[in-house]
Amino acid sequence: METNILELRNISKQYDGKVVLKGINLNIKEGEFVTLLGPSGCGKTTTLRIIAGFEQPNSGELLFLGKDYLKTPVHKREVNTVFQNYALFPHLTVFDNIAYGLKVKRNKYDVIETEVKKFLQLVGLEGFEDKSVEQLSGGQRQRVALARALINKPRVLLLDEPMAALDVKLRKKMQAELKALQGEIGITFILVTHDQEEALTLSDRIIVMNDGAIQQVGTPAEIYNEPENLWTAQFIGDSNIISNAIFIKDNLVTIDGKKIVCVDRGFGENENQIDIIIRPEDIDIVPVGKGFFTGTVKRVNFKGVHWEIIVKCKERKYLIHSTDRVEEGDQVDISWNVEDIHVMWKEIDD
């Protein structure tokens, strides 16, 4: 995964004077699973459409294996797209939907038949050749759309929120199948989604986007555990944000007057232009006198795999995810491990 199959260089896009992409720079490696993650209107789908050739940027470059790709028409790009609604032909059978691209290219029937059977097996739909797509479930339709896209042997597969319409249980099943499929065929997948769990589950790398700009690029672990700014920290999962802490020196911060050891370095001395993030699952509830701060349990909600607990300390409330049950009104201490707090610079408004 060393070769850049796609390079976006300073890509900008406007619609009716509104800027939707603000100089996007991004390299995508061959064979990796990349997710463009962000809220509605962040520019992720526009980025995908520029890669596909459905949109042209107002400025910037798109390179495919080092060569200009903006002038390459859609049908000549080594890129295929699976859309959110799958865009299947309702009047055609499963076989004919999957075979469509090969028929357009005027492949011989025996070649088409062999390839369709191979990809039906790949997506687990053997025996479905003669079914109408209207007889299929949502998950089966998604598999047909994947097979139709992959049978043309693209170098890059673009996925525009293909699991958004599926129920939660089926979506998780399809996520596992999609990840396994990408690993088996080994081509580059680029997924667009607003679902953080989906991005964390599937991706080799995540590109977090907001307001037409890239906020952070990293592995799922880096994005979750080491957010680079407040927006990313709040968008990815639940967070406790401490905005009035002081970075005293390397490996030492002050939170609400208490000196606490951390692993972060390089923020100077007595620096207050920082935020600290602590994830709810990293906070432990311990007996009074054993932790950093004492507080009162204000709320306890059962979430299935954990309890969601609010503890009100003197200076602030903490959100905690714990498998240990406590009762509302209990007096407790809270604590965490040294590596569980993350320091980041405050965002400076333009």
Curated annotation (Swiss-Prot):
Membrane topology, from the record: Peripheral membrane protein
Keywords from the UniProt entry: ATP-binding, Cell membrane, Membrane, Nucleotide-binding, Translocase, Transport
Signal peptide coordinates: none
InterPro entries to which the protein is assigned, alphabetical: AAA+_ATPase (IPR003593), ABC_SmlMolc_Importer (IPR050093), ABC_transporter-like_ATP-bd (IPR003439), ABC_transporter-like_CS (IPR017871), Mo/tungstate-bd_C_term_dom (IPR008995), P-loop_NTPase (IPR027417), PotA-like (IPR005893), PotA_ATP-bd (IPR017879)
One GO CC annotation: ATP-binding cassette (ABC) transporter complex
EC number: 7.6.2.11
Reactions listed under catalytic activity: ATP + H2O + polyamine-[polyamine-binding protein]Side 1 = ADP + phosphate + polyamineSide 2 + [polyamine-binding protein]Side 1
Enzyme class: translocase
GO-annotated molecular function: ABC-type putrescine transporter activity; ATP binding; ATP hydrolysis activity
Localization, UniProt: Cell membrane
Cystines in this chain: none
Domain of life: Bacteria
Domain ABC transporter: 6-236
One Pfam family here: ABC_tran
Binding sites annotated in the UniProt record for ATP: G38, P39, S40, G41, C42, G43, K44, T45
Function: Part of the ABC transporter complex PotABCD involved in spermidine/putrescine import. Responsible for energy coupling to the transport system.
Membership in a protein family: Belongs to the ABC transporter superfamily. Spermidine/putrescine importer (TC 3.A.1.11.1) family.
Oligomer and partners: The complex is composed of two ATP-binding proteins (PotA), two transmembrane proteins (PotB and PotC) and a solute-binding protein (PotD).
Name this polypeptide is given: Spermidine/putrescine import ATP-binding protein PotA
Organism, scientific name: Spiroplasma citri
Gene name as annotated: potA
